[in-house]
Amino acid sequence: MPLLMLKDLPRYECLLEGSKQFPDLDPSACEVYLHLLRTGDEVFRVCDAHLAAHNISQGRFTVLMLLLDKATEGPHARTPAELAEMAGVTRATMTGLIDTLERDGFVRREPDPYDRRMMSVNLTPAGQAFLSKFLPEHFRRTAMLMAHLSESERKTLVRLLAKVLQGTTGVPSMASDGGASPVPSTPVFVE
C-alpha cells in the first residue's frame, strides 16, 4: 500500500538542524530513509497503476507468478499453504486471493495428485493466456524503470538494499498492545 509522503523531502541541512533538537536524529540515515521510502512508494504506485489497468492486484499477480514458476519446474503441486508461505502472507489472505483468481477463471483448485486430502492450485489456460499477454509489457516497464542505472549500479543497489533489509530484523516495531515486536524480514504485498 502506498505511503503518504511529502512532495518535497527535507534538505540535508534541515535534518542537520533538527539533529540539534533531537540528538538521536542521524541526518544522513534519515535522508537515505526518506529517499528509500519515497522511491519505493513511487515504484509501487507505477506498478500498481499498471496492474489495475489490467484488473489485477499486486497480491493476485504474485500468486499467478508463483504458479507460473510451478509450471516451469514440472509437476510439483502448490497448495494454498505453500503459496501463502512463498508469498509471505497468511493462509486466510491466500484463500481470498485464490478465491478471486478462481472466480476470474485464472486458477482452479484440484485434488492434489499426491495427497487426495489436500487441494492444489493450478493455472488455467485463461491464466496462462493472461500472463503470456501481460508479462512482455510488464518486463518492458520494469526495464524502463531501471534504465537510468548501469549494470554495475544495479548490482550495487541490490547489494545495498539487501544490507538495509538485513537491518530490519533488529529494529523493533510497536505492536498493537504497545510492546515491541520484530519487523518482518520479508515485505508483504496484498491487494
For each predicted feature, which ranges?
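N-terminal leader segment of winged-helix/HTH proteins
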Residues: 1-54
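C-terminal regulatory/oligomerization modules of transcriptional regulators
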Residues: 1-24, 152-191
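Pre-recognition alpha-helix immediately N-terminal to the DNA-recognition helix
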Residues: 31, 35, 62-66, 129, ...
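N-terminal helix-turn-helix DNA-binding core of bacterial DNA-binding proteins
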Residues: 27, 37, 45-89, 172-178
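Short, hydrophobic-biased segments on the C-terminal half of alpha helices
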Residues: 80, 98-99
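Charged, amphipathic alpha-helical coiled-coil/dimerization segments
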Residues: 99-159
